[in-house]
Swiss-Prot record:
Transcriptional regulator of the TyrR regulon, which includes a number of genes coding for proteins involved in the biosynthesis or transport of the three aromatic amino acids, phenylalanine, tyrosine and tryptophan. These three aromatic amino acids act as effectors which bind to the TyrR protein to form an active regulatory protein. Acts by binding specifically to TyrR boxes in the promoter region of the target genes. Can efficiently repress the transcription of the aroF promoter, but lacks the ability to function as a transcriptional activator. It is found in: Cytoplasm. GO terms for biological process: catabolic process; positive regulation of DNA-templated transcription. The gene is tyrR. This is HTH-type transcriptional regulatory protein TyrR. Keywords: Aromatic hydrocarbons catabolism, ATP-binding, Cytoplasm, DNA-binding, Nucleotide-binding, Repressor, Transcription, Transcription regulation. CDD domains: AAA (cd00009). Residues 292-312 bind DNA. It comes from the Bacteria. The keyword Cytoplasm applies. The DNA binding ability is drastically reduced in the presence of ATP. Tyrosine further reduces the binding affinity of TyrR in the presence of ATP. GO terms for molecular function: ATP binding; ATP hydrolysis activity; cis-regulatory region sequence-specific DNA binding; DNA-binding transcription activator activity. Residues 15-239 form the Sigma-54 factor interaction domain. Homodimer. In presence of tyrosine (or high concentrations of phenylalanine or tryptophan) and ATP, it self-associates to form a hexamer.
Length: 318
């Protein structure tokens, strides 16, 4: 998702935004950044949720205060409450990360990993900013903007009994859904170009080249690990490249199931009919990102009239 180091002064500059789906997510993030209400960011692993949360903090009025990112899955059950709210044992006091981040922002990465009992205490904190340290009856207050992330839509986790319904309703006010990489095809080429530039500079090699087949493969691949997987795959390929030219074989990825051709599918079909089938699939994919026929024609390097006729021929965009 990023092609450069994060710049707190310009927090959203590191995002590659060409697809309509990602444009919507980033624009919502820019608007929601200015509010103090809890923010929920949902998206698959590797899609950039934590980076988006960080950008929201540095775009907000809290930008000069602390930003604390907490991996909820990494909090031991027996210590999670004291890590969040602090602890008092005799004369010894330890503050939690909410108190430490007072007037700043706390990112709870993987909110569903918290126990249901701790979710109840978090709900109370979200309601009025109050909490009690473990081992103490005195109430404390902290002014913190809370951002939560989840790989799975929270409403599904509510149905599974993993997330409290009341917490979900408290969080489901400002929500950003980060699209999976396979749903942002228009971003794959600029992401790949940016990553290759960044990686080649780190490895101190010339930026590798690639052809159209390589790019089409990137766009066809499922990318279960999303942007993070794309980056790691290109890093590995650049580390092993021999002649400064990347090929499909350089990626060392399993062939996408959708790319496997079965002869039975095309029994009694002519070559023109088979080509037409794949042409229609390509147009459907690109039309989702370029609903303007003029922009689609420009992207595919053909005339506006040719694209309009093809869309009409295949019944796309009716």
């Amino acid at each position: 998702m990023t092609i450069s180091k994060f710049n707190p002064q310009k927090p959203f500059e590191c995002f590659i935004v060409q697809s309509e789906a990602m444009k919507s997510a980033v624009e919502n993030a820019k608007r929601f950044a200015m509010f103090d209400a809890p923010l929920l960011i949902q998206g698959e692993t590797g899609s950039g949720k934590d980076l988006l949360a960080k950008a929201c903090h540095y775009q907000s009025l809290r930008r000069d205060k602390k930003f604390i990112a907490v991996n909820c899955a990494g909090l031991p059950d027996e210590d999670a409450e004291s890590e969040m709210f602090g602890r008092k044992v005799g004369d010894s006091e330890t503050i939690g990360f909410f108190e430490y981040a007072n007037k700043g922002t706390v990112l709870l990465d993987g909110i569903a990993e918290l126990s249901l009992s701790l979710q109840a205490k978090l709900l109370r904190f979200l309601t009025d900013g109050s909490f009690r340290r473990v081992g103490e009856e005195k109430e404390h207050y902290a002014n913190v903007r809370v951002i939560c992330t989840s790989q799975v839509p929270l409403h599904l986790l509510v149905e599974q009994g993993k997330v409290r319904a009341d917490l979900f309703h408290r969080l489901n006010v400002l929500t950003i859904n980060v699209p999976a990489l396979r749903d942002r095809m228009a971003d794959i080429e600029p992401l790949a170009q940016g990553f290759l530039q960044e990686i080649s500079e780190e490895l101190k090699i010339a930026k590798p080249t690639f052809d159209k087949d390589f790019l089409l493969y990137l766009q066809k691949y499922d990318w279960k690990g999303n942007v993070r997987e794309l980056y790691n795959t290109l890093y590995r390929a650049c580390s092993l490249v021999q002649d400064n030219h990347l090929t499909i074989e350089s990626l060392n990825l399993a062939l996408p199931q959708s790319a496997v051709i079965s002869l039975d599918e095309f029994e009694n079909k002519t070559l023109d009919e088979i080509i037409g089938f794949y042409e229609a699939q390509v147009l459907k994919l690109f039309y989702a990102e370029y609903p303007s026929t003029r922009k689609l024609a420009q992207r595919l390097g053909v005339s506006h009239t040719a694209i309009a006729n093809k869309l009409k021929q295949y019944g796309i965009g009716k």
